Every structure is written in C-alpha cells, then in structure tokens.
UniProtKB/Swiss-Prot annotation:
Species in which this protein is naturally found: Wolbachia sp. subsp. Drosophila simulans (strain wRi)
UniProt name for this protein: Heme A synthase
GO MF entry, a single one: oxidoreductase activity, acting on NAD(P)H, heme protein as acceptor
Top-level class of the enzyme under EC nomenclature: oxidoreductase
Compartment(s) where it occurs, according to its Swiss-Prot or TrEMBL record: Cell membrane
Record EC number: 1.17.99.9
PANTHER family attached to this UniProt entry: CYTOCHROME C OXIDASE ASSEMBLY PROTEIN COX15, CYTOCHROME C OXIDASE ASSEMBLY PROTEIN COX15 HOMOLOG
Length: 342
C-alpha cells in the first residue's frame, strides 16, 4: 500500500472542506444564500447562459419572501452578483465531491488503500451525500414566510462539514505520523484533557453557528465585559428557561464566550503538563489565534473577512486537537489512547 499519494489526496480533500466552509461563510455574510431557489444536483451545474435564463431565475427569486422583504426592486446586475456567489458555493461543493470520489475509486481499484480505510472513507462519502441534502434543507428554511435560515439547520450543515473534515484529516494524520521506537509516557489526565478539549471545540463550533444564525454577534460588541457586565441581565427572559440556551441571542453569545475561555484554560493546562510534546504547542497557538479572531470580529461588528477567518480557523483549531490525539495514539503504548481506532 503506497501511503504518500493517498495522504496527499486526503490532505487536498481536507483543505477543500475548509475552503467550502470559508465560501459558505462568505455566502451567508453576503446574504446570497437564498438567491438560488431550486436544488438541481445535476442540471444545476451550469449557470444561466442567456438573458432569458437569467430573467427566469430572477423571477423565481422575486417570488421569495427575501426579495419582498429585503431586496425588493434590485436590478439584474445586483441579482447576478448574489446569484453567482451562491452558484460558486454549490459548484465548489460539486468539485469537492469529484476530487474525493474519482481518486477514491482509483485507489480502491489499484488496491492502494486497505479495507479498513476504504470503510472509513466510504462513511465520509455518505456524510458528503448527507451534507448536500442538509445544505438544501437549510436553504429551504429561508424560503418561507421569514427570509432567514434556521440557525439549527445552519449548525447541522456546519457540523456535518466538521464530521467530514474529521474523518478525512484524521486518516491523513494516521498516514503522516510515524511511530517512534521510544514511546512517550503520558498520564491518563493527558488523554482525558485532550478528549475533553476536542469535545468542547465541537460544542463551541455548534454555538458559533448559533451565534452566526441568530446574528448574536451584533449585540454586546465589547470585550471582556458584555456592555460593562460580566453576566448580562437578559440571559433568561425566554420561557421555558432552557430555551434561552438555544434561542436567546445574549445567552448564546455568553456561552460562546465562556466556552472559549474554558477551552483556552484547558489547553494551557495541557501545555504546561506536556511541555515536551511538540504538537500541544500547535493547539495552544491555534486557540490563541482563534480567540483573537473572535474578539476582533465582535468588536468590529462582524467584518466579513475577519468573520470568515474566524469560521475557517475553528476547523484548524479542531484539526490541531485531533492531530494531538492522533499523535498520542501513535507515540504511546498506553491502552487508554485507543479513543480513535487505528
């Protein structure tokens, strides 16, 4: 089994998933995500080719609540601009699928990947198909009376991208990290902290999607306090109380802030306790950069470029945590490191 070509392919696929996350963020922030009102997996590959085609697409958009509420009277040129943003988003998604599927078939036929790896990557393929449906499911939520996509569906869309990224990148790390003859000695607490951090990062990414979907980044644009308060007064005005966790903009932002500080604290502790393990510094640097990006995004009222960088870097932070766990599994003999199967 030749690992290098497979590893390069997995790395490319992982990068393309991150690219898709960035393009998706730009599409959302540009308010272009609802400009294409139909989902045509095959025939939708081509954009409108004639003036008549463009007119038909614009007429479909004019029937949507978003047009009537937010973009009433936009010109054809303005419509083309938002349409092409969403079109590129969908086109790159299709391209990502091809970049994964075609080499995958080739590597299987040439027997360059083991049966275990084939199964794992086939699972990634299934999640990719599910992701396509989830994307349209999300868009549909904004084509109803309220021209705003569901933040729950937005979180699902992002979470599925994270699962695909995890499956691809972890397999890439597995190929790249070579076990050393002298095994590392790590405590059970190290594994516990590493796993906890990974889980918290996933939860944090979900709440990041909630912040984005609820426009919660447009309130309390101060740091470290929330308009002069450690705990704002309007955290629990929704009933029942538990609903505030998911639908109260102030509460969602508060949780997102708190999780960021908790993750930073745990990563610092992990770094101090494992100063001799180099990958832990990648994770520390990643979490610091991510928090800085988040604070700048908040203080500057969500500038598009910084907000996209913040969204993209959440995957890099997740990847650094995943890499650390994979490194531990490869470089230690402790049975507790079998959190991820080889």
């Amino acid at each position: 089994m030749e690992a290098k070509p497979v590893a390069i392919w997995l790395f490319l696929c992982s990068v393309m998933v991150i690219l898709m996350v960035g393009i998706g963020g730009f599409t959302r922030l540009s308010k272009a995500g609802l400009s294409i009102t139909e989902w045509k997996p095959i025939t939708g590959t081509l954009p409108p080719l004639s003036e008549q085609d463009w007119l038909q697409e614009k007429l479909k958009y004019e029937a949507t609540p978003e047009y009537k509420a937010l973009n009433y009277g936009i010109s054809m040129e303005e419509f083309r601009a938002i349409y092409l943003i969403e079109y590129i988003h969908r086109l790159v998604a299709r391209l990502t699928g091809l970049v994964f599927v075609l080499p995958f078939i080739y590597f299987i036929l040439r027997r360059k990947i083991s049966k275990k790896v084939v199964i794992k990557l086939f699972v990634a393929l299934l999640f990719g198909a599910l992701q396509a449906f989830a994307g349209w499911y999300m868009v549909k939520s904004g084509l109803v009376a309220k021209p705003h996509v569901s933040h729950y569906r937005l979180a699902l869309h992002l979470l599925l991208a994270l699962v695909i990224f995890a499956l691809l990148s972890y397999q890439f790390f597995d190929y790249q990290i070579r076990p050393q003859q002298t095994k590392l000695k790590v405590s059970g607490n190290t594994i516990y902290y590493a796993r906890m951090i990974l889980v918290l990062i996933v939860i944090q990414i979900i709440f990041g999607a909630f912040v984005a979907g609820l426009n919660a980044g447009l309130i309390y644009n101060t740091f470290p306090l929330m308009d002069g308060q450690i705990v704002p007064e309007d955290l629990f005005f929704l009933q029942p109380i538990w609903l505030n966790i998911f639908e109260n903009r102030a509460t969602v932002q508060f949780i997102h802030r708190a999780l960021a500080l908790l993750i930073l604290t745990l990563v610092v502790i992990l770094t101090v306790k494992n100063a001799s393990i180099k990958p832990v510094y990648i994770m520390l640097l990643s979490v610091v950069i991510q928090i800085i990006l988040g604070v700048i995004t908040l203080l500057l009222h969500i500038p598009i470029a910084i907000a996209i960088a913040h969204q993209v870097f959440s995957f890099i932070l997740f990847g650094s945590s995943l890499y650390f766990l994979c490194y531990l599994r490869k470089q230690t003999t402790s049975p507790i490191c079998t959190f991820f199967p080889s």
